[in-house]
Amino acid sequence: MSKRAFNFCAGPAALPTAVLERAQAEFLDWQGKGLSVMEMSHRSDEYVAIAAKAEQDLRDLLGIPSNYKVLFLQGGASQQFAEIPLNLLPEGGVADYVDTGIWSRKSMEEARRFGTVNVAASAKAYDYFALPGQNEWRLSKDAAYLHYASNETIGGLQFDWVPETGEVPLVVDMSSDILSRPIDVSRFGLIYAGAQKNIGPSGLVVVIVREDLLGRARSVCPTMLDYKVAADNGSMYNTPATFSWYLSGLVFEWLKEQGGVEAMAQRNRAKKDLLYGFIDGSGFYTNPIAVDARSWMNVPFRLADEKLDKPFLAGAEERGLLNLKGHRSVGGMRASIYNAVGLDAVEALVAYMAEFEKEHG
């Protein structure tokens, strides 16, 4: 096999090489059955076992309590922006939302189609370079839930704390930092995560929902979007994204082999410390995010002169450092260093950044 590049894409993101190699080995003939997972009936004993193991491994990794359902759904995280209010926001009700960047705003804008949204807090006052402390939040008295994004992939802000909401269910978009460090699932009413960053391939979204929040869907909620229907049918009300589910299960196995979420947190800390440390020590590269709000997963940075962006990216690609261009809405650079991106990738990136600075600084 030719040498694999270091992939810093924000999503679809890097997958563990060992996982891809196993999927490759099983692609034509899954465990001697003479067919691919992509050709299996989702109702077959073999596939039901694949799905059940994936769920159990995820439960083990995150310590998911028994009173939570784990759903493997289609539509990605963006579909959840509508699915959440359809299931949790009653007619005439209000939901609290925290605005920390593009993705949290998108979820907020979608929720407004279904009811009243109270912007409980916003990072706008800090130009989205810092998070508003909870003492600044203005929560509704009778909110159906409070929604926030734990990590903003574009802006590079991440919560290192869990909001306190009392009896109000806490709903979180963890698309880009789930499984990157330990969490207490019991603090949340609902967790959702698009798969294509830290879980597996695109086309799948994982929803972890407390059982008491099921059965609240509005009468106009499509059957396909009703969490209770999904839970009652084992995420198989219709044909699921079978291959994405299977491959995500292989990622969960790999994570357990690596030592679980605690071990990944140690690796991720080392990666982000190396990259931020280099940026902060440089007079050539900058990251504007407040230190206590910096993302472990998505590191945006700028060069001293934006005219150097194109040669920087060209040189990076020549060295097998791919997908470092920042999001089109903000520009600059962005290194996404999810679980499957090793320390060796970050070391190679830092070495190139130092070389480029020496030549152009």
Curated annotation (Swiss-Prot):
Residues engaged in binding pyridoxal 5'-phosphate: 77-78, 103, 153, 173, 196, 238-239
Catalysed conversion reaction: O-phospho-L-serine + 2-oxoglutarate = 3-phosphooxypyruvate + L-glutamate; 4-(phosphooxy)-L-threonine + 2-oxoglutarate = (R)-3-hydroxy-2-oxo-4-phosphooxybutanoate + L-glutamate
Cellular compartments annotated: Cytoplasm
Signal peptide positions (record): none
MF terms (GO), sorted A to Z: O-phospho-L-serine:2-oxoglutarate aminotransferase activity; pyridoxal phosphate binding
Cofactor(s) for this UniProt protein: pyridoxal 5'-phosphate
GO cellular component, one term: cytoplasm
Alphabetical keyword list: Amino-acid biosynthesis, Aminotransferase, Cytoplasm, Pyridoxal phosphate, Pyridoxine biosynthesis, Serine biosynthesis, Transferase
Keyword Transferase: yes
Residues recorded with modification N6-(pyridoxal phosphate)lysine: 197
Protein name: Phosphoserine aminotransferase
Gene that this sequence comes from: serC
